[in-house]
Amino acid sequence: MASLGVNIDHIANVRQARQTVEPDPVPMALLAELGGADGITVHLREDRRHIQDRDLDLLRATVRSRLNLEMAATAEMVGIALKIQPDMVTLVPERRQEVTTEGGLDVAAQQGSLKGMVDQLQVAGIPVSLFVDPVSQQLEAAFKSGARWVELHTGAYAEACWADQSFELARLTEATARARSLGLRVNAGHGLTYQNVEAVAAIEGIEELNIGHTIVARSIAVGLKEAVREMKRLVQNPRREPLFG
């Protein structure tokens, strides 16, 4: 049974749209936990477009589940992670022009530099996950980097047309099995919604799904606690048959 990590970046997006103080993502994280979130995920971007350093400091002091820090593989971010001591760091690719993360890390091309950062964080007691596309080459490179976890990028599945979703789901299933055969633990996320999450949640071996935008969008209608509860039910009790095919 997969657990649910709730990404609260989009709450901070609303605040930053007006450059004001509300909504504050810190108390919203508490509401997400009260709704059943097993962890809180935030992405501290280099341009600070949504989550701010102040948010991260306060979240570390207040989150009672698990705090997963998504960040670019840079010296600045490694220094912040070493200071904050999140429960996990997920290294993600980052481009200033993108609206959201557009793909997985090219671990195979950056294996040398990533290994140094992975070692530095894990020696300090912080488990490291690498956000990767569901491709064997990247999984093998992730293993060689010394990371203990991968987070599979589910964007291709989430964005696929009806006819292609079964193919993308098979890729995720195969990638999960391959990662586990290497000794890696597996999370997944990106683009998952109330409509498409169950098939991914049913994949044996995926331990946690990180989901944000759809929960925050749903919360406008039903409130954050209820939106998290609804997603938690789908993640923990998925239909075993996909809605397509």
UniProtKB/Swiss-Prot annotation:
Transmembrane segments: none
Top EC group: transferase
Keywords: Cytoplasm, Pyridoxine biosynthesis, Transferase
E.C. designation(s): 2.6.99.2
Binding site for 3-amino-2-oxopropyl phosphate: N7, R18, G191, G212, H213
Subcellular location: Cytoplasm
Disulfide cross-links: none
Stored CDD domains: PNPsynthase
Entry GO terms, CC: cytosol
GO biological process terms on file: pyridoxine biosynthetic process
Catalytic activity: 3-amino-2-oxopropyl phosphate + 1-deoxy-D-xylulose 5-phosphate = pyridoxine 5'-phosphate + phosphate + 2 H2O + H(+)
Keyword Cytoplasm tagged: yes
Swiss-Prot/TrEMBL site (Transition state stabilizer) positions: E151
Active site, per annotation: H43 (proton acceptor), E70 (proton acceptor), H190 (proton donor)
Gene3D superfamilies linked: Aldolase class I
Domain of life per record: Bacteria
Binding site for 1-deoxy-D-xylulose 5-phosphate: D9, H10, R45, H50, T100
Protein name: Pyridoxine 5'-phosphate synthase
UniProt organism field: Prochlorococcus marinus (strain MIT 9313)
Lineage: Bacteria, Bacillati, Cyanobacteriota, Cyanophyceae, Synechococcales
Gene that encodes the chain: pdxJ
